[in-house]
């Protein structure tokens, strides 16, 4: 018997799995090609992901998905994305010069920014001092937003409240 190469994409099915697949085809389910990932989100926000799933569609429009479901670790994926952004931060897009303004306009912009910063505190700074109601928010979510956006707890809680506890949108709003 010949060996299967380690990097090949071969699936070996048990006898019971072969029977189940034959029954699925007899039910009229059609295989859907080209699906690389399927995710499911539960009510409590937990996300399950199936990489390289086998997807079938019924005549009624329902889908049947086979594959190994894993809990999707969003924080790990977010950290990887931020790491890649930081690595590419110093790289300018092709065709863009490092200096897009003349020196006088840059100095004028810097002076205007310095003047506005010393004149009055921003509205966001007032949020830092005030206590924000954290009821209905998950403490882990607040900590994650604080860590990823680099903001104080009050700002993180306020952003989560404004975005209905959506971590991604809260981080994007604070980072932008």
Curated annotation (Swiss-Prot):
Keywords: Cytoplasm, Nucleus, Protein transport, Transport. Belongs to the NAC-alpha family. One of its GO terms (cellular component) is nucleus. Residues 137-176 form the UBA domain. InterPro entries: EGD2/NACA0like, NAC-like_UBA, NAC_A/B_dom_sf, Nas_poly-pep-assoc_cplx_dom. Residues 85-127 are annotated as: Disordered. GO terms for biological process: protein transport. PANTHER family: NASCENT POLYPEPTIDE ASSOCIATED COMPLEX ALPHA SUBUNIT-RELATED (PTHR21713). It is found in: Cytoplasm; Nucleus. Residues 14-78 form the NAC-A/B domain. It holds the Pfam family NAC. Gene3D superfamilies: DNA helicase RuvA subunit, C-terminal domain, Nascent polypeptide-associated complex domain. Part of the nascent polypeptide-associated complex (NAC), consisting of EGD2 and EGD1. NAC associates with ribosomes via EGD1. This is Nascent polypeptide-associated complex subunit alpha. Component of the nascent polypeptide-associated complex (NAC), a dynamic component of the ribosomal exit tunnel, protecting the emerging polypeptides from interaction with other cytoplasmic proteins to ensure appropriate nascent protein targeting. The NAC complex also promotes mitochondrial protein import by enhancing productive ribosome interactions with the outer mitochondrial membrane and blocks the inappropriate interaction of ribosomes translating non-secretory nascent polypeptides with translocation sites in the membrane of the endoplasmic reticulum.
């Amino acid at each position: 018997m010949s060996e299967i190469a380690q990097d090949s994409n071969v699936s070996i099915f048990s006898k019971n799995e072969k029977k189940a697949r034959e029954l699925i085809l007899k039910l009229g389910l059609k295989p859907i090609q080209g699906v690389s990932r399927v995710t499911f989100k539960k009510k409590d926000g937990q996300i399950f992901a199936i990489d390289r799933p086998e997807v079938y569609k019924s005549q009624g429009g329902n889908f049947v998905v086979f594959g190994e479901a894993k809990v999707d670790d969003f924080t790990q994926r977010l950290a990887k994305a931020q790491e890649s952004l930081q690595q590419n931060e110093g790289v300018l897009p092709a065709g863009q010069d490092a200096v897009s303004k003349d020196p006088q306009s840059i100095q004028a912009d810097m002076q205007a920014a310095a003047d506005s910063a010393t004149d009055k505190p921003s509205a966001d700074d007032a949020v830092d001092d005030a206590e924000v109601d954290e009821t209905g928010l998950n403490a882990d979510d607040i900590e994650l937003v604080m860590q990823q956006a680099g903001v104080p707890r009050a700002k993180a809680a306020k952003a989560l409240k404004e975005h209905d506890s959506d971590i991604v949108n809260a981080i994007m709003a604070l980072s932008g």
